A protein has these predicted regions:
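Conserved catalytic core of the tyrosine transesterase superfamily
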Residues: 1-191
Length: 191
């Protein structure tokens, strides 16, 4: 059985992000990828988002956080909306839409959110363009966030909290740490 992997290579990650921005421009698909990479939300939670979850129509600005009850765990979480996400969502012209509209609407079924399968196809198309291995899926966005946070020295306890994991073992498995990652630590530490 294959396991979904994070996107570890920065070069491939940049190619992956570039696909819907430059190669096959689509602001919705680009925003989906950027939001997934930068929030560590599960795709099931991303697809349930509405415009009002990210945009304050009274203040005419982005909300500071996405406040959500995770579908899988039932836990409440607050996710900061960083500049990358704000820029990607800005191209979607949210202010001209209804607050209750799906943030990532289906083009095929008007009024409905994007399906999980369609989100998978969007991600897979960008992954193929970037030359990524076959084990890339919707969950890779969430895992990629954790992997790169870990590489930037975010403490494992913080990642456990972000992911709402009950044990470090789950988080460790999630990050996809392999022998190459361990080798880099030994190469980097020179006492």
């Amino acid at each position: 059985m294959s396991t979904t992997q994070p996107i570890k290579s920065i070069k491939q990650l940049e190619q992956f992000k570039k696909y819907y921005q430059e190669v096959s421009p689509d602001s919705r698909n680009y925003a989906l990828i950027i939001l997934g990479l930068n929030t560590a939300l599960r795709i099931s939670d991303i697809l349930r988002l509405h415009i009002a979850d990210v945009w304050d129509f009274r203040q005419k600005c982005f909300n500071r956080h996405i406040e959500i009850t995770e579908r899988k765990t039932g836990k409440n979480t607050s996710i900061y909306i960083n500049q990358e996400v704000r820029q990607a969502l800005s191209a979607c012209h949210l202010t001209s839409l209804d607050p209750d509209d799906a943030l990532f609407p289906s083009h095929k079924y008007k009024g409905s959110p994007l399906s999980r399968y369609q989100a998978y196809r969007i991600i897979k198309k960008a992954a193929i363009y970037a030359g990524l291995p076959e084990h890339i899926s919707c969950h890779s966005l969430r895992k990629t966030f954790g992997y790169h946070a870990w590489k930037q020295s975010v403490p494992p306890a913080m990642l456990m909290d972000i992911y709402n994991h009950s044990s470090y073992q789950i988080t460790k498995r999630y990050l996809g740490i392999d022998q190459d990652d361990k080798d880099q630590v030994f190469e980097k530490i020179r006492l």
